[in-house]
Amino acid sequence: NIPRDRFYGQIDVEIPEPIRIERGAGGEQSLDEAADLLASAEFPVLLAGGGVVMGDAVAETIELAERLGCPVVNSYLHNDSFPASHPQWCGPLGYQGSKAAMKLIARADVVLALGTRLGPFGTLPQHDMDYWPADARIIQVDADAKMLGLVKKISVGICGDAGATAKALTARLADRTLACDATRDERAATTAGEKADWEAELDDWTHEIDDFSIDMIKEAIDEEGNWLHPRQ
């Protein structure tokens, strides 16, 4: 136990100025291999993780995703890694995640895991779906080399900053013809369809439709002095 008065008082300290640490995109060979793999993909999926957020790299991720025209899913607890307003966004994987995201990544032949450790909460089965694409080629990008290939078998590992890596890959793919270019519209329609189906299912979860619940809601609404809606 520490006496409370020990936590009070004044001391002389020097607060250091913040420094900016240069973070690179990863090795040239790894970037070239990743670009080749993405160029050959028929149904690529981009998995955006916490590294995108911490690296302030959402804009770079959007640019890369739009070049690929691919579905984008969020890693567990990192819904802010890609904007939900974007048509290619599909929602989070894993625990209490989006069925649309899981169904789409299950179809992937190449997954670009950008700034994510691929932890178990975002890769294990959910909604009775074992959705992780066992046969897909995985490109994992993480600033910590110890995370590369730790959880999932990968084809290419890139130790680099998520934003710098996304920018480098976009530059490598900018003038190339991609295998998935021919199916861009078809894949966009598939993405939109899966999202619409998931939204419809969520609507059924949101509103009570059974007779008992409807009667209880009506009874509560009509109760005098009850100002709180039953659903709240």
Regions found by a protein language model. Give the residues of each.
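Short internal beta-strands
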Residues: 1, 69-76, 139-142
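Active-site diphosphate/adenylate-binding microenvironment
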Residues: 189-232
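Glycine-rich, acidic loop regions that bind phosphate or pyrophosphate groups
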Residues: 78-197, 201
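Anionic-ligand anchoring segments at beta-strand to alpha-helix junctions in alpha/beta enzyme folds, i.e.
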Residues: 26, 33-111, 230-232
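Glycine-rich beta-alpha junction loops
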Residues: 1-7, 50-52, 145
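Short, solvent-exposed amphipathic alpha-helical segments in soluble enzyme
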Residues: 14-16, 56-69, 126-131, 156-157, ...
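An N-terminal, well-structured beta->alpha segment
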Residues: 18-32, 214-217
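Aromatic-enriched
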Residues: 4-26, 180-187, 198, 205-206
